[in-house]
Amino acid sequence: MIQANTVITGDSLTVLRDMEADSVDMVITDPPYGIDYQSGRKEKASRLAKIANDKTPFIWWIYDAARVVKRGGVLCFTRWDVQQVFIDALRLAGLTVKSVIVWDKKAHGMGDLKGSFAPRYEAIIFATKGRYELPGKRPDDLIACAKVGNQSLIHPNEKPVELLEQLIEATTTPGALILDPFAGSGSTLVAAAKTGRQ
């Protein structure tokens, strides 16, 4: 049994496989997207390492996430070009995809500066195990929340604590056990503690 308020270091696939079934209330995570990203900006690239294991859509964790989550759900960050891969994997794992939430970052991000539109959103797939009812008022599927500023980043694709707080409060009740198999900068852990979750 996993202890509340615990950080486990190790390979996420191995740790998930070793966890008990139906042991967490919600999985909220930002897995590698499979885009092999590293910033082209010299000052950012020199501070932040390339994202590990980010060459192909990393979906294998989803099957064990579906196994360990109770009658709750999974919130999975993704981006437009690999979104369908994650949706298909969530469905194959037996989860029901309920929504794709759009996170408006309020400023554009990485990408081809001259050959594509400036990306200013990320998608968050919300999938559930069994019949699951949101605990409060029905939230919108659009969340506007400023991204973490470049000078404050400690991870190349860091998520703001405020955004994670909104997601946690919309999908769980105080005391819920949250699992983030790809903790990155630890934003999910901080948001869980700030909202009275474990």
Regions found by a protein language model. Give the residues of each.
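Core catalytic lobe of class I
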Residues: 1-198
